[in-house]
Amino acid sequence: MCIRDSPETVRDIAFQIKDIKELGVEIGIVIGGGNIYRGMRAEKQGIDRVTGDYMGMLATLMNALVLEDALKKTGIAARVQSALQVEKIAESYFNKKAIEDLEKGRVVVFACGTGNPFFTTDTAAALRALEIGADVLLKATKVDGVYDRDPEVHSDAVFFSEISYIDVLNKGLKVMDATAISLCMDNNLPVIVTNIKKKDNLKKAVLGEPVGTIVKGVDTL
């Protein structure tokens, strides 16, 4: 979900989240900003990496505000919490406040990553999931799950319905970055990777239906 998506796409995603919320599920969302700017591009553009990463964090804030607005228009209470202080437009992130908002039925949208350079949105998602005591980390992406190589480039790419954290790391699969996967592995937090563009995939994943790929420990496969 990003600000360059059509209003219809943004609205559809907001309604998917609403459907899940109506199941009684507490939802925290970590949003990226790669559609606007990626800090990793900074050095190629002659920009200091740290500066570039902060630019990327601000991009996530823009996307978070768009999503918050879309959610509110569906009738869902939502709050943006930012890892960087931007008091006029978002609350500062504090895990106890985030948990309180979740318990009150609000969707919390986490912006600005971890608030530190050199950490990806994936790592921020793993960190926030652990901090709020999430049962599962759902990575919504543009492909159907985890493959042995890029399915958009290789038509014969092999799909995994489930895979262990350690296999993701050993095979160098581009599910999430190594830091994020390691955090999930060390804390036994399952990850579901699914295609956000397919209607009701998010809801199906939450209900435990087989959509996408589940990444978990070897002993639970």
Indicate residue ranges for each PLM-predicted region.
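C-terminal catalytic "cap/lid" subdomain
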Residues: R4-L221
